[in-house]
Regions:
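Residue-level marker of positions within ordered structural domains that often coincide
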Residues: 1, 62, 159
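Sec-dependent bacterial lipoprotein signal peptides
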Residues: 1-18
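Generic detector of short, well-ordered, non-transmembrane alpha-helical segments enriched
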Residues: 16, 53-54, 150
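Short, low-complexity N-terminal intrinsically disordered segments enriched in polar/charged residues
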Residues: 20-55, 59, 63, 67-69
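Short beta-strand edge/turn micro-motifs at domain boundaries
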Residues: 21-26, 122-168
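Extracytoplasmic/cell-surface-exposed regions of Actinobacterial cell-envelope-associated
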Residues: 51, 66-67, 74, 93, ...
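Short linear functional motifs in flexible/disordered or boundary regions
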Residues: 69-70, 166
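Surface-exposed, charged secondary-structure patches
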Residues: 72-147
Length: 168
């Protein structure tokens, strides 16, 4: 075999492998602190606020590095001047305000998450799915249930579930 034949075979092999990947979903590993399911995320959030477990609650929110990795995958139009820095600051400010309010309001209440649902159409991106329209149905000690919106959207990466921020 001549050198250019070997090069051509190598190129064909690379193209064949690349062709096998085309159209397949990118599978990323779950992020640290992710919940294994939507219901476990809702239960973890409710339990965290009731118990005042700030480390657990903060672990469910995308960190700066995670947000930095997810942001470009979302294909957000930044031509209006609302780029990554603005989005990160806005999420942190609004999320922290809601976090403090829920932490004070739910501490030591007798609440159990019954169901967590996201009713919006899923948005799929490279290795990331965003589930909008999320609510948690909670039950109190009297048996009464209420639907709450502690976060609006869930980010699913590698089967793990996290949130952008707590919503007010």
């Amino acid at each position: 075999m001549r050198a250019h034949d070997i090069g051509a075979l190598a190129l064909l092999a690379v193209l064949a492998v690349a062709g096998c990947r085309e159209g397949q979903a990118v599978e990323l590993p779950p992020l640290p602190g992710s919940a294994v399911s939507l219901d476990s995320l809702g239960q973890g959030v409710v339990d965290g606020f009731v118990r005042g477990d700030t480390a657990r609650l903060r672990g469910y929110v995308l960190s700066l590095d995670e947000y930095r990795d997810v942001w470009p995958r979302l294909q957000i139009d930044t031509t209006a001047g609302f780029g990554f820095d603005w989005s990160w600051r806005d999420n942190r400010l609004r999320g922290e305000r809601a976090f403090r309010r829920y932490l004070a309001g739910f501490h030591e209440m007798s609440l159990t998450a019954v169901e967590t649902r996201c009713t919006g159409d899923p948005h799929r991106f490279e290795g990331v799915t965003v589930l909008p329209g999320c609510t948690i149905t909670v039950r109190d000690s009297s048996g009464a249930t209420e639907e709450m919106r502690l976060f609006k959207s869930v980010v699913v990466i590698g089967g793990g579930h996290k949130i952008f921020r707590y919503d007010d």
